[in-house]
Amino acid sequence: MMAFAPPKNTDGPKMQTKMSTWTPLNHQLLNDRVFEERRALLGKWFDKWTDSQRRRILTGLLERCSLSQQKFCCRKLQEKIPAEALDFTTKLPRVLSLYIFSFLDPRSLCRCAQVCWHWKNLAELDQLWMLKCLRFNWYINFSPTPFEQGIWKKHYIQMVKELHITKPKTPPKDGFVIADVQLVTSNSPEEKQSPLSAFRSSSSLRKKNNSGEKALPPWRSSDKHPTDIIRFNYLDNRDPMETVQQGRRKRNQMTPDFSRQSHDKKNKLQDRTRLRKAQSMMSRRNPFPLCP
């Protein structure tokens, strides 16, 4: 008989582990039974411990676990606890992520490219910038290789730089010369102004108006708290039923009670008729009032 073979008689006095700390390793059934008993006992102790004691026990158990066991605990925690801040580009398919980015304007896409390397790769794809270039009929005159990325974004930026969008400038005072100008003298009260005097008066008025305005700096730094990135969020909308109920309450408060007003008018008319009747009766009873 082998030394590590399971015993035939499991109910003998040698296999009793009720009042003993010895665990029969060579017998799997008894070992599982003892493990379940001790696990239940540990659960009862854990229920009676305070929060700080439970944290100390969990910290000690995690420190004793191996790397694979710690990874197992991490996966279990991720299943139980929902993620608070989750990157949708890592969970959604690539096609859906590009579809979401396609609704952004060029400035927002450039801001998204500064989040991380993964977002930079998505925000600079040609599938997004090609549509924005074709919208203004901006084409490229070469066929890019598969290894070249961000060609359409660079082309968009270059075309925007080449646009000459400036405000209309008034000609300088010295350059604005009217040839053969003759002053018209007339004794009439409504004298006509010459074009040169009219231009001088308009320029003086413009200078007076612009003197109060501050000149813009040559370069304005980026806003620390930008507001152009704030979009209309559907989750911020109010409940439609609640808005309808509030509108009805306001209407009821604003509209007067016509039934009550009509009742008050009837009461006033009745009081007036009674007063007139009483005055007429008094005048009949005393037709000749005594003079003082």
Swiss-Prot record:
Keyword tRNA-binding appears in the UniProt entry: no
Basic and acidic residues bias spans: 260-273
Tissues of expression: Expressed in heart, spleen and colon.
One Pfam entry name: F-box-like
CDD domains reported for this sequence: F-box_FBXO16 (cd22172)
Residue ranges, annotated region (Disordered): 188-224, 238-292
Keywords: Ubl conjugation pathway
InterPro entries in alphabetical order: F-box-like_dom_sf, F-box_dom, GEF_Ubiquitin-Prot_Reg
Low complexity composition bias: residue spans: 194-204
Annotated ranges, domain F-box: 86-132
Subunit structure, interactors included: Part of a SCF (SKP1-cullin-F-box) protein ligase complex.
Task of the protein: Probably recognizes and binds to some phosphorylated proteins and promotes their ubiquitination and degradation.
Protein name: F-box only protein 16
Taxonomic path: Eukaryota, Metazoa, Chordata, Craniata, Vertebrata
